[in-house]
Curated annotation (Swiss-Prot):
Residues making up the signal peptide according to the UniProt record: 1-21
Pfam families for the chain: D8C_UMOD, Zona_pellucida, ZP-N
The entry's keywords: Cell membrane, Cytoplasmic vesicle, Disulfide bond, EGF-like domain, Endosome, Glycoprotein, GPI-anchor, Immunity, Innate immunity, Lipoprotein, Membrane, Receptor, Secreted, Signal
Function: Functions as an intestinal M-cell transcytotic receptor specific of type-I-piliated bacteria that participates in the mucosal immune response toward these bacteria. At the apical membrane of M-cells it binds fimH, a protein of the bacteria type I pilus tip. Internalizes bound bacteria, like E.coli and S.typhimurium, from the lumen of the intestine and delivers them, through M-cells, to the underlying organized lymphoid follicles where they are captured by antigen-presenting dendritic cells to elicit a mucosal immune response.
Domain of life: Eukaryota
Residue ranges of every copy of the ZP domain listed in the record: 200-456
Record note on quaternary structure: Interacts with SYCN. Interacts with bacterial adhesin fimH.
Annotated coiled-coil segments of the chain: none
GO biological process, one term: antigen transcytosis by M cells in mucosal-associated lymphoid tissue
Gene Ontology cellular-component terms listed: apical plasma membrane; cell surface; endosome; external side of plasma membrane; extracellular space; membrane raft; zymogen granule membrane
Region (Flexible ZP-N/ZP-C linker): 294-317
Name of the protein described by the UniProt record: Pancreatic secretory granule membrane major glycoprotein GP2
Length: 509
């Protein structure tokens, strides 16, 4: 019995000893199966790994150990074909020599090859790959056999390469650490008509924009020398989005060589943009003629006139910014032909047209209102001798020649009056208008006029809001000093039409 018991213990010990390694292996298998690399990985969001990246650098992945997932603009999978040297921001790029597994295949071993010295697989290393739910792959990396080697990502697998749709002259490429539309390098053209400039005729500036890619196809480099008729307006090329470059010039006569032409309906600015590859010009340069036509209105006519008789006033409104008002004398009811020069000379019985415009400020909210407009025989706006044309926002109803076309309803005000002169030794007339910026949201801007209202209300002028124009004289008058408007010793022997009426009404107003 003792011998049998000893034999049984020995057998049991042997069985236990043999069973222990098997049980340990089962435990390891259970731990391995419980670890899913699809849920335990490190993200590599490095667009510079893209196979399209040609930036020179010597980045090395010798420190990459573990499971990784590639994401971002550089691509989400390793390339399966040989990658040219010096791509992926390294010397010898690593690519996957084999296909990616499917979900059913689980974890597979693949060979990663490094391209160097003309050999697509000069160095090798084993990489484990697994396909994961959600259509992505994870890779178990074990560093690199040498430096500088780096694991690449296939640019064609990038989820969001170029956000904008590239034009035919562009290609979606990875450059400077990002995907974008860049000019194609294979563009080549000798047809200058293929260059289609864009012209923007603005109120304050004229802008000519050119397609940088089309310029490249015509042989122009990155640095283009551009200048207008006036050489002082050179080196004004500005880079814009989507591979466009532009040149701007002020919307002014003679600025940057602008040539101004006017017909009965439009003001036309003409200029020429010249392009060259170098500052020292030996080859034929490219000339681009352009012009902008602006329909004539009060504002444009003042901008295009060389020496208009005009007055300007800047007004600051609390919380609303700064406003600019201009007032000028015009020759007819179209208000597009301002008087120019040192003085306005009118024929007997002719009409004088006065226009004012709110040029700068919130014209969608504020209307221009002429509160008081009056004439004086001197340029002094406080001269006690005044003849009111507009009083308390309403026209002088005792003067039938006064016609207010617009006042308080928009950013413009216009009125006309038949020319007159003051009795006595005065040769000149000066006009003065007190303005008000009327808030159309909170005020009644359009005047409501009556004859009794004009008589009863007293005029309280604000000199800080008064615009001054002049001098004005009649065509047949003797030569006068137009600088200060002082009385002339000669005076007038002949009275103008409407002379006596303003004198009598001056006592009433």
């Amino acid at each position: 019995m003792v011998g049998s018991y000893v034999l049984w213990l020995a057998l049991a010990s042997c069985i236990l000893t043999l069973a222990s390694p098997e049980q340990q292996g089962n435990r390891n298998l259970i731990n391995t199966r419980s670890y899913d690399p699809c849920q335990n990985y490190t993200l590599l969001d490095e667009p510079s790994r893209s196979t399209e990246n040609t930036e020179g650098s010597q980045v090395c992945d010798k420190d990459k150990h573990g499971w990784y997932r590639f994401v971002g603009d550089g691509g989400v999978r390793m390339p399966e074909t040989c990658v040219p040297m010096y791509r992926c921001q390294t010397d010898a790029p690593l690519w996957l020599n084999g296909t990616h597994p499917t979900l059913a295949e689980g974890i597979v071993n693949r060979t990663a090859c490094a391209h160097w010295s003309g050999n697509c697989c000069l160095w090798k290393t084993v990489v484990q790959v697994k396909a994961c739910p959600g259509e992505f792959h994870v890779y178990r990396l074990e560093g690199t056999p040498k430096c500088s080697l780096r694991y690449c990502t296939d640019a064609s697998t990038a989820t969001d390469k170029c956000k904008n749709l590239c034009r035919p002259e562009e290609a979606c490429s990875f450059l400077n650490g990002t995907w974008d539309c860049f000019c194609r390098s294979d563009l080549n053209s000798s047809d200058v008509h293929s260059l289609q400039p864009r012209l923007n005729c603005g109120a304050k500036e004229i802008q000519v924009s050119l397609d940088k890619c089309q310029l490249g196809g015509l042989g122009f480099g990155d640095e283009v020398i551009a200048y207008l008729r006036d050489w002082n307006c050179s080196n004004m090329m500005q880079r814009e989005e989507r591979n466009w470059i532009s040149v701007t010039s002020p919307t002014q006569a003679r600025a940057c060589g602008n040539i101004l032409e006017r017909n009965g309906t439009h003001a036309i600015y003409k200029n020429t943009l010249s392009l060259a590859n170098e500052f020292i010009i030996r080859d034929t340069i490219l000339n681009i003629n352009f012009q902008c036509a602006y329909p004539l209105d009060m504002k444009v006519s003042l901008q295009t006139a060389l020496h208009p008789i005009v007055s300007s006033l800047n007004i600051s409104v609390d919380g609303e910014g700064e406003f600019t008002v201009r007032m000028a004398l015009f020759q007819d009811q179209s208000y597009i032909s301002p008087y120019e020069g040192a003085a306005a000379v009118l024929a007997v019985e002719s009409m004088l047209y006065v226009g004012a415009i709110l040029e700068k400020g919130d014209t969608s909210r504020f209307n221009l209102l002429l509160r008081n407009c009056y004439a004086t025989p001197t340029k002094d706006k406080t001269d006690p001798v005044k003849y009111f044309i507009i009083r308390n926002s309403c026209p002088n109803q005792y003067d039938s020649t006064i016609h207010v076309e617009e006042n308080g309803v928009s950013s413009e005000s216009r009125f006309s009056v038949q020319m007159f002169m003051f009795a006595g030794n005065y040769d000149l007339v000066f006009l003065h208008c007190e303005i008000h910026l009327c808030d159309s949201l909170n005020e009644q801007c359009q005047p409501c006029c009556s004859r009794s209202q004009q008589r009863s209300e007293i005029v309280a002028l604000n000199p800080a809001r008064v615009l001054d124009l002049g001098p004005i004289t009649r065509r047949s008058s003797a030569s006068v000093d137009i600088t200060d408007g002082t009385p002339s010793t000669a005076g007038f022997l002949l009275a103008w039409p409407m002379l006596l009426l303003p004198i009598l009404l001056a006592e009433l107003f």
